[in-house]
């Protein structure tokens, strides 16, 4: 596979002077520059900021600050979505608020209009994850308080409603839209829930693999769903675990890494928390017979400093091995060869694959 | 030192004087009257001040009763400096850890590769302290720019390189003098205090240079030339000499001899033999990596200088300043001690001049030290300077002085990392640093400094997670302090907890990890996050606490569980699992859910399979010792319709007897004072009794 060759992989490490909570690519707004959204927290001033930075195409080791916005609390989850007019940013906080912002297309920066779901109106305590999508630009949010919220981002006002409230009997840690009316959540004990807004009241389907044997259980930290395979959800979590769950075969997860039950088929890339997983649209599947049961290549980053691409039954490709945790990464939708990731030791890395 | 308190100022460790005091404004939003202030240390260099007000009568409860404010002390440190410091701290983790693991590989046998590892380590650390990269040259080179523009060098880097030269770099032991020449050319700008240095003179002269028509007319020109030559900055000397106006086209005819002399000196300067393997680009001289070749070249070069010195051309040179200036340069190259002393400013500059022109073969610390002492006598009055104190300690082979200087001037990061160089440098230092000392509580000096550095790291929210690397390298106290550090982390925050557990996993502190999970479990449980509480207690396999919270959960279930709200419980029940032993009686909920579910499916007579399943679940529940007694009656009451099943009996004689026994047991238990009455209609007991009796009768008949 192409990315295995170090000559075709360019890495630019850019040290920052603040801790990076989250990092995302912004959709392309200019021919000459690329734009990056960073959620940072400054330990000196205890300030949390949202920043738009420009990345020079010819010299990707310089990030020029363009626009920045002070936040009241640290960012727990950050999502970007292209709307017909301008990109929409949603940022959730550890204090339980969600902030919606639009990016100005012309003078790249925050356009001044913002909507806030205040603390305690939707969630009490930290929001663990949000996702943008749904029927007409909706933001689904999950929290440690066991609530599932839905915010419709219209032109003017936000409309907020609670989809489910477990009253703390469970906590959710990840969420992802599957279709305009369906979404998937993940939580403690590697549990994954499938929800359908047309069938309110409870999750439609529950998955909790039989992890009790051998390795101890863990938490799902991140979920992704490929737009062409909405029946399968990809999840990453504790103990280096990356697995997929197909709702058509609800009892059997396909383990891509970690939680070593079937050590032969699933090589463990990492032994600690997998913080984020995304389908890697750049790495082409080595198996040319594309079958719908085969899992597409997956990128993951972990607490023990690994950024890697893994595929069912293949040798994983390590893109980056760092001495500190890689907390977050994002694959550029328009340019899937480019990846940005943020490191625990106050730096970001930009990887370009060829 | 804690516990040392005194009433008199004489005994105070840090004498307090009112002139030293510093006022920091405290910003809070608490309305007066303020009744109490409570002050405590927060992380790092900040204080946590709680401002508490006295509640006034007749006020609404909305008014906050107080506020906690964090006050940063020492805010005058620049932000970027802090970030820069953290970058160095992060960057030094890997080289340090790699070196430790290499040293630990074979502790007994002599590690032949160790010097190579140490120099690799030293280079990596050195590169963190800033690269002396020359800024890109301007497109049109300015001939009058004599000094190259470099990034501002740092004291730490200068100190590190000094230690690298003497302790780590064994390969270049033979050319320490030349390395010192390089060192001074990089850092001469750092050592000036009240007294000028050659570098500062050069900088001054460069600003004047633009306005000078004929440089050789200015006595300063010759001064800086000889000064630069004295410390071996040959490239600068040549560049300056070429500015001599005899090179200009309109003058070359009339000043041919003069120009010839200048150019001959230029050639001699650039051909100076150097006892070193190579030179970096742009530097001048001819390198010799062995002594005999060097001696030969040196003699020849000296011969050429002497020959030029006695040449008849000087008489033909009309320009007096040029003649005298060039002669002075020749004297320096011939090693005239008094000229050298007159042209240099700082003792270290004179020291370097001696190496270059008088004693190029100086080896051994003792001779270097004596030379340094001599130079200091010639150039007294240099104000104390941290780099010079350090150099003094190194030359005097006094490890204690080096340690003290490192610690005093450069802080705990420097000393912790420099000790690796010191121990590699000499056996004596190695013994001194590794000797266990009673006055330090049985630890050695090396460990002491690592512990101090780890403490500094622990005090910052972003660097505490690299402290374990240093603590783990401390044999005696390290693990104990690591445990304390881990226990101090707030576990309510999932990210911190997971980091904590990860560190425990890496250092095999399973017990500490389990305790953190238990604390987190109880924390979440208390804050109403029941699922998280159960999850972490399960992870910690804490049966005791699981049993305790199980009782509370049952109370909650007993009150709230209706068929509707079971949907809420679904997630938690899934989490509890069906057979996990660590659930501490909580597996009851799982079976209860199964029973309720099958009971719900029993809607009419046709659902015989569901009814059979429900009755099996009922027997399982009643047989299970973990089923709490207070649920027995509600379970039986729920299953009255199973007992009264029209078609046939669902429970046989022994099963019915079991249920009857349980009912009997329950009646006995009701007499006890701590019995909790189930929330059921008053006729529940009698209807269950009746149904059971009927069922028993039918079952006997059927058999």
Question: What are the functions of these language-model segments?
Answer:
Chain A
Residues 15, 254-280, 314-334:
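Conserved blade-ending motifs and adjacent loop-strand segments that build the rim/top face
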Residues 35-41, 89-93, 139-143, 183-187, ...:
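Conserved beta-strand element within WD40/beta-propeller blades
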Residues 18-27, 73-82, 124-132, 167-178, ...:
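Canonical WD40 repeat/beta-propeller blade segments in eukaryotic WD-repeat proteins
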Residues 328-354:
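Blade-level signature of beta-propeller repeat domains, shared across WD40, Kelch, NHL, RCC1
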Residues 3-4, 54-63, 86, 97-117, ...:
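Per-blade loop-tip surfaces of WD-repeat and WD-like beta-propellers in eukaryotic adaptors/scaffolds
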């Amino acid at each position: 596979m192409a990315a295995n060759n170090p000559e075709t992989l360019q890495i630019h490490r850019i040290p920052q002077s603040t801790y990076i909570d989250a990092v995302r690519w912004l959709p392309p707004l200019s021919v000459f520059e690329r734009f990056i959204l960073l959620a940072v927290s400054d330990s000196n001033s205890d300030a949390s900021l949202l920043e738009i930075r420009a990345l020079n195409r010819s010299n990707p080791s310089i990030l020029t600050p363009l626009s920045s916005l002070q936040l009241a609390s640290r960012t727990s989850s950050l999502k970007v979505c292209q709307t017909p007019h301008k990109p929409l940013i949603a940022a959730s906080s550890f204090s339980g608020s969600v902030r919606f912002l639009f990016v100005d297309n012309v003078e790249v920066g925050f356009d001044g209009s913002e909507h806030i779901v205040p603390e305690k109106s939707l969630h009490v305590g930290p929001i663990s994850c949000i996702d943008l999508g749904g029927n007409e630009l909706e933001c689904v949010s999950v929290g440690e308080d066991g609530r599932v919220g839905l915010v419709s981002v219209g032109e003017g006002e936000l409309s907020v409603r609670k989809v489910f409230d477990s009253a703390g009997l469970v906590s959710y840690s990840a969420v992802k839209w599957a279709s305009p009316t369906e979404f998937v959540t993940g939580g403690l004990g590697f549990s994954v829930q499938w929800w359908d807004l047309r069938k309110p009241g409870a999750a439609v389907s529950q998955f909790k693999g039989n992890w009790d044997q051998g390795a101890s259980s863990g938490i799902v930290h991140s979920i992704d769903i490929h737009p062409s395979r909405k029946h399968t959800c990809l999840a990453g979590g504790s103990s280096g675990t990356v697995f997929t769950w197909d709702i058509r075969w609800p009892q059997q997860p396909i383990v891509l890494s970690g939680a070593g039950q079937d050590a032969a088929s699933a090589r463990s890339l990492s032994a600690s928390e997998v913080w984020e997983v995304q389908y890697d649209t750049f790495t082409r599947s080595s198996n040319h017979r594309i079958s719908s049961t085969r899992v597409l290549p997956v990128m993951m980053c972990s607490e023990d400093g690994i950024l890697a691409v893994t595929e069912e039954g293949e040798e994983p490709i390590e893109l980056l091995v760092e001495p500190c945790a890689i907390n977050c990464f994002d694959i550029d939708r328009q340019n899937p060869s480019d990846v940005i990731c943020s490191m625990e030791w106050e730096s970001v890395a930009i990887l370009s694959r060829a | 030192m804690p516990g040392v308190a005194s009433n008199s100022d004489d005994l105070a460790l840090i004498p307090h004087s009112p002139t030293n005091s510093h006022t920091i404004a405290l910003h809070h939003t608490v309305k007066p009257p303020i009744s109490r202030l409570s002050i405590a240390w927060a992380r790092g260099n900040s204080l946590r001040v709680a401002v508490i007000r006295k509640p006034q009568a007749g006020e609404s409860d909305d008014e906050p009763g107080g506020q906690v404010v964090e006050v940063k002390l020492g805010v005058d440190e620049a932000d970027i400096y802090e970030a820069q410091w953290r970058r160095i701290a992060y960057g030094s983790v890997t080289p340090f850890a790699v070196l430790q693991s290499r040293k630990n590989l074979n502790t007994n046998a002599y590690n032949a590769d160790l010097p190579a590892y140490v120099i690799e380590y030293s280079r990596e650390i050195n590169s963190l302290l800033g690269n002396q990269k020359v800024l890109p040259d301007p497109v049109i080179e300015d001939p009058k720019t004599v000094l190259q523009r470099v990034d501002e060098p740092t004291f730490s880097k200068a100190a590190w390189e000094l230690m690298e030269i003497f302790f780590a770099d064994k390969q270049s032991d033979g050319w320490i003098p030349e390395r010192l020449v390089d060192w001074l050319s990089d850092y001469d700008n750092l050592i000036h205090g009240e007294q000028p240095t050659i570098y500062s003179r050069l900088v001054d002269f460069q600003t004047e240079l633009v306005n000078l028509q004929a440089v050789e007319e200015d006595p300063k020109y010759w001064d800086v030339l000889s000064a630069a030559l004295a410390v071996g900055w040959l490239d600068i000397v040549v560049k300056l000499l070429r500015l001599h106006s005899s090179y200009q086209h309109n003058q070359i005819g009339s000043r041919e001899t003069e120009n010839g002399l200048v150019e001959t000196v230029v050639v001699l300067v650039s051909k100076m033999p150097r006892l070193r393997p190579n030179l970096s680009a742009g530097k001048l001289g001819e390198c010799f990596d062995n002594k005999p070749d060097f001696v030969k070249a040196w003699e020849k070069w000296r011969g050429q200088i002497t020959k030029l010195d006695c040449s008849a051309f000087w008489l033909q040179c009309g320009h007096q300043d040029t003649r005298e200036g060039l002669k002075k340069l020749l004297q320096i190259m011939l090693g005239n001690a008094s000229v050298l002393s007159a042209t240099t400013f700082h003792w270290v500059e004179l020291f370097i001049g001696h190496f270059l022109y008088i004693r190029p073969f100086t080896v051994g610390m003792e001779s270097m030290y004596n030379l340094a002492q001599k130079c200091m006598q010639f150039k007294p009055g240099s104000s104390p300077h941290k780099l010079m104190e350090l150099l003094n300690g190194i030359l005097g082979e006094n490890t204690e002085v080096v340690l003290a200087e490192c610690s005093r001037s450069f802080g705990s990061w420097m000393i912790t990392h420099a000790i690796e160089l010191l121990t590699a440098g000499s056996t004596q230092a190695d013994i001194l640093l590794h000797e266990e000392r009673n006055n330090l509580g049985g630890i050695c000096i090396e460990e002491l400094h690592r512990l101090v550095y780890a403490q500094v790291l622990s005090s910052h929210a972003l660097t505490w997670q690299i402290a374990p690397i240093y603590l783990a390298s401390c044999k005696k106290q390290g693990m104990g302090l690591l445990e304390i550090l881990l226990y101090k982390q707030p576990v309510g925050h999932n990210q911190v907890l997971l980091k904590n557990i990860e560190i425990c996993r890496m250092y095999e502190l399973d017990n500490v990890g389990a305790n953190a999970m238990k604390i987190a479990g109880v924390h979440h449980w208390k804050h109403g996050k029941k699922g998280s509480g159960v999850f972490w207690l399960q992870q910690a396999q804490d049966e005791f606490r699981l049993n305790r919270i199980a009782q509370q959960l049952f109370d909650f279930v007993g009150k709230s569980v209706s068929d509707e709200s079971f949907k809420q419980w679904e997630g938690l029940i899934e989490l509890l699992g069906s057979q996990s032993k660590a659930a501490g009686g909580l597996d009851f909920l799982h079976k209860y859910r199964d029973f309720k579910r099958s009971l719900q499916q029993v809607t009419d007579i046709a659902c015989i399979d569901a009814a059979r399943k429900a009755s099996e679940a009922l027997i399982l529940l009643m047989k299970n010792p973990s089923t709490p007694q207070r649920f027995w009656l509600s379970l039986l009451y729920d299953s009255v319709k199973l007992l009264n099943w029209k078609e046939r009996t669902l429970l046989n004689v022994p099963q019915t007897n079991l249920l009857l026994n349980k009912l009997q047991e329950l009646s006995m238990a009701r007499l006890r004072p701590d019995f909790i009455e189930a929330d059921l209609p008053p006729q529940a007991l009698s209807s269950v009794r009746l149904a059971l009796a009927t069922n028993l009768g039918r079952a006997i008949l059927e058999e």
